[in-house]
Amino acid sequence: MAGRDESKKSQFSKLHHLSLVVKNMDEAIKFYESIGIGPFKDYPPLTDYVKLNVQDETGFFHLKFKIAQVGDIQIQLCQPGEGKSPYKDFLEKKGEGVYHLGFVVDDVDDSEAELRKLGLQVLSSGRREDGSGFSYMDTAQKAGVVLLVRQSPGGKQKKPK
């Protein structure tokens, strides 16, 4: 691909999940399971995040997630609740649909720094005590969807600085 250093690993090489915003979680799960996608289970608690850069903490902590595994890809359903959130904004402006694509990375801080060097801005981010977490990148205008990088808990541990 022209203009790209092939020796550098893309931050978007390991697709982890698709996140879909829904109005009604129960109805969405009923539909997806009726066509063979599921079962859905609870997403780990959002209260695990100790450092947050989000639009509104009330909106963040009232997001309701359910997840199902489809092959190697996770399907996340998200129903916004009380407070403000990008998910709620998306639902109000565009209706239900794919809000973001999530990519797993070895080190979320390093990935975020690399993406900033490419001119991408961070919409929101969160980190757990072990340094794992997420960064939503502001790509919707150019890519048609928000792109997210995430480091799973228990993944590569932070190097002492």
What are the language-model segments listed below?
Residues 2-8, 15-23, 65-74, 90-107, 109-161:
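Vicinal oxygen chelate
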Residues 2-7, 14-15, 23, 37-38:
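The feature marks the first
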Residues 34-40, 118-121:
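Conserved acetyl-CoA-binding loop of GNAT-fold acetyltransferases
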Residues 38-89, 133-155:
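Conserved short beta-strand elements that form part of the metal-binding/catalytic scaffold
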